[in-house]
Regions:
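Serine-esterase "nucleophile elbow" of acetyl-processing enzymes
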Residues: 18-90
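Bacterial Sec-dependent N-terminal signal peptides
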Residues: 1-20
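Charged helix-capping and loop-helix junction motifs
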Residues: 106-116, 156
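Generic structural signal for well-ordered alpha-helices
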Residues: 80, 113-118, 160
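Cell-envelope and extracellular/periplasmic
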Residues: 67-68, 95-100, 114, 134
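A short helix->loop->beta-strand "cap" motif at the edges of active sites that frequently abuts
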Residues: 124-128
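Catalytic His-Asp segment of secreted/periplasmic serine-dependent ester chemistry enzymes
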Residues: 9-12, 138-217
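Surface-exposed cleft-lining segments at the edges of enzyme active sites
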Residues: 65, 97-109, 145-152
Length: 217
């Protein structure tokens, strides 16, 4: 019986991974057909970015959502061409939590973000880049689906410190601490804002909006 359970679990992981990759490819293919222009504001990241209707939230038709569920900092580097080539006015980046959940170090996450910043500095230097902190996670709910994520609270804090330091002194780059606006007194993602310990509910996106609204305008 134990072997059957282990086999079923392994098959589930394989199927989930395949489905995730298929979704990633589908979204990338779509984004490659949708041009970015010089007056656009791009939101770039993983499922937490992907899950919001940013243009509607800010009532701004120039906002383009380029979040892809499951994305990681290294994978994100492979899909920058249409974004950098479009020379957007602004870029809001949030990435890294999936890396940490997969065992990637905070140092490597920061290094990949550094590569992104270097590329924009070289190819689209007038784009204003807002690097947002990785959000907190919450594992209080034992039914939380993102168990590999909510064990990474300490790594998230460390990664945010490295990312903030990375942004210092760079032209047209600003680090934004969104983490502090969504964390509770116990150092976890406020339960008002999530239903699975990782992703955001509507109130969570509104709290995020309050932090960055002055930069989006």
């Amino acid at each position: 019986m134990k072997k059957v359970i282990l086999l079923a679990a392994a098959l589930f992981v394989v199927v989930a991974s395949f489905a995730q990759n298929e979704y990633n490819y589908q979204k990338r293919s779509l984004f490659e057909q949708l041009p970015i222009r010089g007056n656009d504001i791009v939101f770039l990241g993983n499922s937490i970015t992907d899950g919001c209707e940013w243009a509607e939230l800010f009532n701004n038709r120039h906002i383009k959502n380029r979040g892809i569920s499951g994305d990681r900092s290294g994978w994100l580097l492979d899909r920058l061409d249409p974004i950098v080539g479009g020379h957007p006015k602004k870029l809001f980046l949030m990435i890294g939590v999936n890396d940490l959940a997969a065992g990637v170090s905070p140092e490597e996450v920061a290094a990949n973000i550094g590569k992104l910043l270097d590329r924009f500095a070289e190819e689209s230097p007038w784009t204003k880049i807002y690097v947002q902190s990785i959000l907190p996670v919450n594992g209080v709910d034992t039914k939380a689906k993102a168990k590999n994520h909510w064990k990474k609270g300490a790594e998230i804090i460390e990664a945010n410190k490295l990312i903030e330091a990375l942004c210092e002194g760079r032209k047209n780059v600003l680090y934004i601490d969104v983490y502090s606006a969504l964390v509770d007194q116990k150092g976890m993602l406020d339960q008002r804002y999530t239903n699975d310990g990782l992703h955001l509910m509507g109130e969570g996106y509104l709290a995020w909006k309050e932090v960055i609204e002055k930069y989006v305008k």
